[in-house]
Structure formats: C-alpha cells, structure tokens
Amino acid sequence: MSIVCTFFLFLLNTSFAFAFAIPKPPIVRRLSTTVTSNSTASSCSANGNPIDECWRCDENWKDNRKNLADCAVGFGRDSIGGRAGEFYTVTDSGDDNPLNPTPGTLRYAATQDQPLWIIFDRDMVIQLKQDLQVASYKTIDGRGNNVQIAYGPCLTLYKVSNIIINNLYIHDCVPVKRNALSSLGGYSDGDGISIFESRDIWIDHCTLEKCYDGLIDAVNGSTDITISNSYMLNHNEVMLLGHSDEYSGDRDMRVTIAFNYFGEGLVQRMPRCRHGYFHIVNNIYRDWKMYAIGGSANPTIFSQGNVFIASNNQFTKEVTKRESADGDEEWKEWNWKSEGDEMVNGAFFTPSGKEDSPSYAKFSSMVARPASLLKTTHPSVGVLSCEIDQAC
C-alpha cells in the first residue's frame, strides 16, 4: 500500500473517531478577579468538605465504591442507595425498548426490584426514549467514566426511596409523551431529575444544564434530600422545591443544598421553595440574572456560609425573592436567615421572620464551614475525572 493511501486511511480513521468522540462536561471557570483561586490545592482534602474528604483521597476508590454510601451529609444522609445489593455494569448505551429493557442497559438495571449499585464499562451518552423511572435502593455511579444522559427525557424518581446519583452529566432533557403503561401517564416534565413523593435521595457531583423545565425538581411530599457538589449552569428555572402554594403535603419537606456551584447562564430558582425546611450551605452563586433564592407559602430558609457574587447589573443584586399574594405583611413573618454568608459586588440578602427562631436550630442539617474557605481553592464540583489507582 502506498504511503499516500496509508496516510489517507489514517486521516479517515482519525476523523471517524473524532466525529463520535463524547464531549467532556463543562468545568468551572475562574471565579472572578475579586475572589482568589488556587487550583493547585488538594481537591480531595477539599478544605473541610466532609463528603469529598470521606472518599476522594482513597486511591482504591474503584474497589471501595460502596464506601460512598457512608459519606452523605444533610437531610439526605440516610440514603444508602444500592449498598446492600450487587454491582451491575452498564455495557449498552441504548434504550431501544423501554417497555422491555435490554439487559446491559441503564434502564434494565435501574428498574430492577432488588438493590443494585450501577456502574459503567466505558464513556457513553444515553439518549432515553422515555423518562427513566428509577426503582428504590439504587445507586447510579458514573465515577471513572464520562456518562451523560441527554437529548431526550431524563430521570424520574416516583414514590421511591434510597437513591444515590453520582457523577453524571445531565443535559438537554426534553419532555415526551409517556407510554400507556407508565404509572405517571401524560408527558414527562423535561426536568433533569424529577422527584415525586420520594425520600432519602442524594444527588452528588453531577453537572446539569439546558433542560426544558427544571434541572432538579422535588414535589408532592418528597423529603430528606441532599443535593451536593454539583455544577449547574445555562438554565432558567433551576430548582423547584414544593409543588404549589396550595399543596400542604410539602410542609414536611426537608432539603439540604450544599457545596454546589450555581454558575454562568442561570436566571432564577436556586432554589425556589414552598412550605418546607431548606438548609442552603456553603454554595457559590455567581451572576444570577433575576434572583438566587426564592419562595412562597412560608418556607423556612437558612442560608449559611455561602458566597454570593452578583453581576454588574444594578437591578439583580438581591439574592432573595418572595412571592406573596398578601404583600409584605405576609412574608415578613417567614423565617429566612443569612448567617456567615459573604456578599460580593453588592449582593444582598433580605432576611425576615425571627432572627432567633428555634426552627433554624431544629432544621440545621449539617455544620457549615466559613464562607472564606470557599474562596481559597478552585471549586471542585460537578462531574469528576477520576483515574484508576489515583485519588479522585
């Protein structure tokens, strides 16, 4: 074979490989000129992040995957996922038959009745044909691979408990009409992760963007949820916690939002809360286009040790937003408190209610670290690039 022909085949094969290469998840850009960033600091020690310190320094994390189930904090800390079950390796990125899933697919594993710890044999983009209704006692663990759920309906947690979702890039989720056998019926919402009537849920180190509705929504009596170490970007209505002002079943909702990075291109609802109890701890917020934290129907919101970096738009400096049918006199009684938060570039939090309300202590789900620590290292959030036999 001539040298020219050989070179042509090399170019053809290289182009073919690049055409089907799976793009990497986005990473956090430098915070700003006003916030120091030191990317050389150890990410596994994480300056007091108890979740990451629990497992990321372990060079044998691949062989000790289930240790992750001991690392949750906050209201979702009791979620064990699939720790009591066997490992199941996803080998097939397809979703050809949602009613009768093919063995080896994520849908096949996630819908089994028994506990399972689900891992993946390679990088893959999973384009679902129907939203995936995950069964109880499942861990979906994408560590070690670039696993994406995208370009179709995404994940639904409906009347389940003990779910751990870790290290997935979830993006470009859209609504679809559910099949006739779906227990939910109608259309899926187009959320990245929809949580209905579920409890003991932990979502950690995920990257989420560009979905039709919310990135993560929890409604209809869902409770005991932790959303941590995740990177959210490029979205309008980010996170809804509580179904409606009239739905009293969400009064016992408890959610912890911790160590996340709410990044570029976000507009509102980080989160938007109703009725329940919400502990928002050690997150970084930057450049929200309307507001960061909002709510209605008398939620208790405890914002602790966060960094809020406002944009240069003079009309979007406020962190908070209340939606009240009866005006200021109603929301002034709601217990919203900021403690140890750092406000950058004119950001401000409007508190309300009783400064010393016992509800803050009762529903404090974890110990906050000083907000200043969030500014000493580059945020280590979202999907991680974990290598075998190395600390992650």
UniProtKB/Swiss-Prot annotation:
The keyword rRNA processing does not apply. It is an enzyme of class 4 (lyase). Pathway: Glycan metabolism; pectin degradation; 2-dehydro-3-deoxy-D-gluconate from pectin: step 2/5. It comes from the Eukaryota. Its EC number is 4.2.2.2. Glycans are attached at residues 38, 220. GO terms for molecular function: metal ion binding; pectate lyase activity. This is Putative pectate lyase 21. It comes from Arabidopsis thaliana (Mouse-ear cress). The lineage of its organism: Eukaryota, Viridiplantae, Streptophyta, Embryophyta, Tracheophyta.
